[in-house]
Amino acid sequence: MKARVNTCAVQQSCLQSSALGVLGSIAHPVGRPGEYSGRVMQGKSQVAEFSLHAGPDVDATQVTIDLARIAGSPLVGQPYKAHKYSVNSDGYLMLFVSEGLGGFWVQLSSQGTYRSRVVFDSRRLKSGDLFIATLIRPGTHQAKMPRAVAAIRVRAPEASDKAFQPPPPAGMTCTKTGFVPKRLEVYATQGIVFGFETTSRVQIDLTKPAPARSAKSRRSARWRGRPDIRR
Amino acid sequence: MNHMTVAASEQSFQAVFNHLRDGFHETASGGGDFGPFSASYDVGVRLEGGTIDLQNNNTVLLSELDIVYDPLILRLGIDIPEICVGGFCIIPSPFGCILRAPRICIFSADPDIQIDLDLSGLIESEISGTFSIDTRYFVDPGRPAGMSDHDAQDADVPNKWQLFLNPGWLDIDLIDIADTVGNILDAAIDAAIDGLLGWLPGWARSLIRAILGPIVALVRAILDIADDIQEWLSNLLGISLGLFNTVVTLVADYFASRYPFLEFEDPIQVLDPGVNLIAVKVPIRDLDVLVTDDEMVVTANVGA
């Protein structure tokens, strides 16, 4: 019997847009045609780089990069490879982490004639960017951005005769005055898409796990009656 | 006119057959891969019952010889699907999804579960068939060349005339599969999943079970079990795994070539040894068997 569990996904109790890990992903609209280069960082170390061609000639509306897959391990002398991607200039760059401890961030620079210019930094998400969180642990979570918080209640799927299918993703917007809405209730594995009207970052913490629910209700027989005591 | 004639009534024949039948205890194993699942079995087979009816066409009719499957362990190996989250559409359009969330697998690599079903004593089947009686001459390979018949008897390596039951045809009928098999399968599926997920935190177990849906129904679907589990099991054991063919082959081989139901030493001893006298033995030739409605008659001649 063999099983492989994504332990980082199961044990994760904190998601950060500025340090991307399992169950969080970022979508960035490319916006303009051109040649871009990306630096993938983990903490203070660069662990990968990639080039991105964006043009109207490309059919793909989305390029998805698994940062855990392309990352090398500089600490053990494993060099990273340069990866090449292409996407439609009206499309999106999707960054995610499939496994591992995470902590990734990405800088995307446009390659100009004379010098490069940073056009996207995943630590500071701007208008048009999206942070997508998939919470799997039932309980109460707190979403935080600088000077604002929101409550997210994650419900466990109900026991049913059919396999659980999560509802479509819920939405939350980061505005200058805080999160809209301030409260959200979702099912475990249902996505939450954070939009941005202001430059910000999002962190989600599990604040109160749902109490464990036994899989099978216990039944016990009880006899009630008056004992027949004869003296 | 034969020199020797020995006859055995049907009752005597039945008693000899019962003795031979009780010595049968064979084991077998087999398995196969059937795409979504694999199956294998380990079986021990005994025989009980069985009625002998001598026929006047020189054959023996055997009916209702019960096959006792003890033990019968059926092992089912199943790949349950990956359990992934995400993959939902974020920006839909009339022409398809423009932006889709990545799919992240939290329980992956096609985890295998093995379900062990102890079906010992839950399947009833019986064998019927006809046998002719083959006579064969057996020279013990352990007997050195030039060894005298008396010495061979002392060393327990004498030559022998042997009578075997040689099957003409054998049929195996599946009589019944106990109703409880369904409950046993369901309980085994639950236990296997509990074992697979047991080390996960409770909320993760509940989540995975919720995503998988009713696990018993899922596994039954993977195994392609429709409403009738008895029919499914009968097809799996009988057709896919060939268990019943294996059993018939074991039974046929046992009677036809492994154990004779009667044997005579050659030369046969007709007088015990006396004081200063060796045993008197006469060689047997032209051994033949005739079966009638009432008895089996063995004839032979004496001669070098």
Give the ranges of each region predicted by the language model.
Chain A
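Extracytoplasmic copper-binding redox domains, predominantly the cupredoxin/blue-copper superfamily
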Residues: M1-R231
